[in-house]
């Protein structure tokens, strides 16, 4: 039986990804691999991660670190001290890998499931319409929601500046605003602080591998989880 395997934020942790796939006995001929975004950055092997995911025919959605990489390639972003993307940008197959990465959408759907990197605004009634057809190279407020959302108010307004926790009243974790609102289960990542999220209609998979936590998978068909510990902490909080 085909399994849909959703993977939390990998962020260049290729070794942990390979170990998790071994634990899952992943078979690319029958299983569908769907990362939640942030394929790259902060971890030790972003280049190897992209090559592996591409070779396995992975799907997935774009995250904020993926957008940062694409913008850096266009010369629109400067590298930050914590970035680990130089190896990707210097690779002979960089353009091929980034073309593959750029083709990831901001939302994917299956019957009963939404996949998005960060979250969905509580103001949205049709997330697919809000996020379909957006160009990752053109700034759009809905892209910020899909790739950066953590806290918001009940109208979906994000705090400015984006502090964690935010200053000011009315802000709550976005998923508390939308819990039970959609008939679909929302699979997401991006925010390691809450850890594994398993609530009604919510599966949050960012368990902080790059920070020394774990890399986590959710198997949709039987609603089970699998994870492996990080070999070490790759990036400071």
Q: What is the meaning of each model-derived region?
A:
Residues 1-52, 56:
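N-terminal active-site segment of His-dependent metallophosphoesterases
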Residues 32-37, 79-89, 155-165:
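Short, basic, glycine/proline-bearing loop/turn elements
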């Amino acid at each position: 039986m085909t399994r849909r395997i959703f993977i939390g934020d990998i962020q260049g942790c290729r070794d942990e990804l390979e170990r998790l796939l071994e634990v899952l006995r992943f078979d690319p001929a029958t299983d569908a691999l769907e990362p939640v975004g942030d394929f790259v950055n902060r971890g030790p092997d972003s280049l190897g991660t992209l090559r592996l995911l591409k070779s396995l025919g992975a799907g997935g959605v774009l995250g904020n670190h993926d957008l940062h990489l694409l913008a850096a390639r266009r010369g629109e972003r400067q590298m930050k001290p914590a970035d680990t993307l130089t190896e990707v940008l210097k690779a002979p197959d960089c353009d091929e890998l980034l073309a593959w990465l750029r083709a990831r959408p901001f939302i994917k759907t299956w019957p009963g499931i939404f996949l998005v990197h960060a979250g969905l605004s509580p103001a949205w009634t049709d997330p697919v319409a809000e996020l379909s057809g957006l160009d990752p190279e053109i700034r759009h407020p809905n892209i910020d929601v899909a790739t950066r959302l953590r806290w918001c108010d009940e109208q979906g307004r994000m705090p400015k500046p984006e502090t964690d926790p935010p200053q000011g009243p009315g802000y709550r974790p976005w998923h508390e605003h939308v819990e039970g609102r959609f008939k679909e289960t929302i699979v997401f990542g991006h925010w390691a602080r809450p850890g594994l999220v398993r609530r009604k209609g919510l599966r949050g998979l960012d368990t902080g591998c790059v920070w020394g936590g774990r890399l986590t998978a959710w198997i949709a068909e039987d609603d089970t989880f699998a994870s492996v510990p990080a070999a070490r902490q790759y990036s400071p909080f």
